[in-house]
Amino acid sequence: MVVTIFAKIALMGQWVKYKAPFICRNTKKVSKSRWRWLSLRSNSKYMATVGFSERIYLQYLRTKFKTISKLAPATAGRMAFDLFCTPYPKYKKRKAPAIFHHAKKRTVVLSDQTKIHGFEWLPNKPNNETVLIAHGYASYAYKFEHYITPLLKMGYRVLAFDGPAHGQSEGKHIHVVVYQEAIQKIMEQAGPVHHFIGHSLGALTLSMIAENIGQAESRKFVLIAPATKTTTTFANFFKMMHLNEVTITAFLNDVSSKTHHKVEFFAADRALANYKGPLLWVHDEKDMVCPYEDIIDFKRNAPSNIKFLITNGLGHNKVYKTADVMDQIMAFLTPSK
């Protein structure tokens, strides 16, 4: 009986996972932009915008965790964390923007032999410094195409890699520790790196890098819409998945086991509390993925070396694509003469 139930759940999950994008193929908005596992990680306001296929899959997942938690709560917790760390399926090959055809392809290898693929651009008039771009969850390096040329014009060598389990890179899961190792390997194998730009999960990971990399006054960080408090992200995920307390406890234990830290450790405000180098923090007041409310206390008491650029109405994913925001980021990164 139990085996039959699990078999049906597994089959249903596979059907929805692979068929849902095609169910939605006649609805351009849904098939192109809304079929994203990111919706499973955000808050209830965002859920109001998701499509029919996502709601089917979400209900399947809720039923799955509820059933498994009754028999093996530790397993349910591990499976929930695995889901949290798994980007949505790569069912569509993306066309490379023109600027990427002029890049040199680079590959770095992680400790588990996972290959991380990226791109390198060299300026005509080098200033002998490098900028590394770290994209967010369920994103990829292509989305920062408009950053490349302005950085090259300022003389920077530019690196942009697809994170683990994203874009052209290998891997099945990503979380801060995995992403942090990837960035450290990029610095070792493709460095040196002098300045950093990161969005969302990439920005949170860069806050951890900033905490550990040293306090060089010449090194600049740009953090765009960082996941300020992982506890908020997890709480939204628990609520959305209808996880019970036993499963939540198992989930948090699995996080601690795999990362060697409690979830509270993974917070941009904690990591940057004593950081002394120049840093630009960009955030939108209407961000529904990484809430602006999470940064208010830190912003009020932040050290003077951290500058804030606060926008209104751009949300989480448009904030780094807007011309005015990009101009201010480039002004911040302009080399001193």
Label each PLM-derived region with a short phrase.
Residues 314-323:
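Catalytic histidine-centered segment of alpha/beta-hydrolase-like enzymes
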Residues 275, 281-283, 287:
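Short beta-strand/loop motif that positions the catalytic acidic residue
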Residues 148-170:
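Conserved alpha/beta-hydrolase
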Residues 213-261:
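Hydrolase active-site cap/lid region
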Residues 35, 43-44, 51-108:
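An N-terminal hydrophobic leader/cap segment in hydrolases
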Residues 173-194:
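Alpha/beta-hydrolase active-site loop
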